[in-house]
């Protein structure tokens, strides 16, 4: 029984250590929406929107492709009201860029997402005693995804862009 407890405690410790590793590496996500400045201060992403989390998806068959909205969570910032207006007016953005970066990697951009002919489909604000957050969703006609491959020395090697047309 004691041996089982020790094994369980070791496994739990590994899960805790493992789950903190990605966070400790300091990944950051930024989004560029033309004409809508954000509050990012990163030297390579000045005035971009800082993204807290993101979700995207695609479903396909041999005959059709359906892309789900790309949704982000962000803290309330100067971009918020402008994104609300873009949603209300049905404004189309030729290209929106999202970059997942990790400091210390040469060129820095690990994952590059570009959505084309994008529209804000919803924008919602929620909050508590801490800084309010906003959830913003985008529809788009096509998406290009590029995962740049890191090596053991921290250098990134160009990935192959993959483009999906969403109908």
Language-model-detected regions and their locations in the chain:
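Glycine-rich, low-complexity intrinsically disordered segments
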Residues: 21-167
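Bacterial N-terminal signal peptides
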Residues: 7-17
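Positively charged n-region of N-terminal signal peptides that target proteins for export
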Residues: 1-4
């Amino acid at each position: 029984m004691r041996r089982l407890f020790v094994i369980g405690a070791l496994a739990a410790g590994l899960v805790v250590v493992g789950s903190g590793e990605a966070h400790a590496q300091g990944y950051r996500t930024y989004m560029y929406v033309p004409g809508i400045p954000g509050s990012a201060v990163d030297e390579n992403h000045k005035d971009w929107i800082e993204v807290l989390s993101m979700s995207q998806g695609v479903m396909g068959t041999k005959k059709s492709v359906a892309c789900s909205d790309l949704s982000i969570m962000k803290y309330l910032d100067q971009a918020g009201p402008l994104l609300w207006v873009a949603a209300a007016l049905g404004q189309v953005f030729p290209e929106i860029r999202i970059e997942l970066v990790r400091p210390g990697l040469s060129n820095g951009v690990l994952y590059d997402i570009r959505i084309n002919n994008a529209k804000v489909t919803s924008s919602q604000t929620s909050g508590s005693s801490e800084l309010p957050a906003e959830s913003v969703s985008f529809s788009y006609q096509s998406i290009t995804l590029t995962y740049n491959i890191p090596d053991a020395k921290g250098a990134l090697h160009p990935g192959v862009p993959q483009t999906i047309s969403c109908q």
